[in-house]
Regions:
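Secreted/extracellular ectodomain signature
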Residues: 1-132
Length: 132
């Protein structure tokens, strides 16, 4: 994959959706690939319209994730925020709930898998590399 560029987390808040976060600075027609080169989506539009073409099943070092993993997103399948499901804008670990995606799902559950997860839980996050 070459040298890494800047990344943004696929996380939504009430003031900024995950899609808006990663679209800023990203090319609309740029393919999204895993660290190992596997095509995930033709572009961001494809990702939110159809979900990932391949499971997002490697970490940022290219290490395979063997088990089903929860991933913090606060994000609906269309890339918009899941209202009141963002752990108070990702600022608290108690008294709030958030929504998660489920890795290795390739349907809408990749980002919109479950709501009401306690914010104190430790889950992964998805990151998207921005265009250079």
């Amino acid at each position: 994959m070459g040298s890494p560029g800047a990344f943004r987390a696929w996380l939504s808040t009430s003031s900024e959706s995950a899609l808006a976060r990663v679209t800023t600075g990203a090319s609309a027609g740029r393919p999204l690939r895993l660290y190992d080169g596997t095509l995930v989506a033709a572009d961001l539009g494809d990702l939110v319209d159809a979900g990932p073409r391949a499971a997002i099943d490697v970490d940022f070092k290219g290490v395979a994730l063997k088990d089903t993993t929860a991933v913090w997103t606060g994000t609906l399948a269309n890339g918009s925020d899941n209202p009141t499901r963002d752990c108070a804008g990702w600022t608290t670990r108690s008294g709030q709930t958030g929504s998660i995606g489920v890795q290795p799902k390739t349907n809408s559950q990749w980002t919109e898998g479950k709501v009401n997860e306690p914010c104190g839980a430790s889950y992964r996050i998805y990151c998207v590399e921005l265009a250079k």
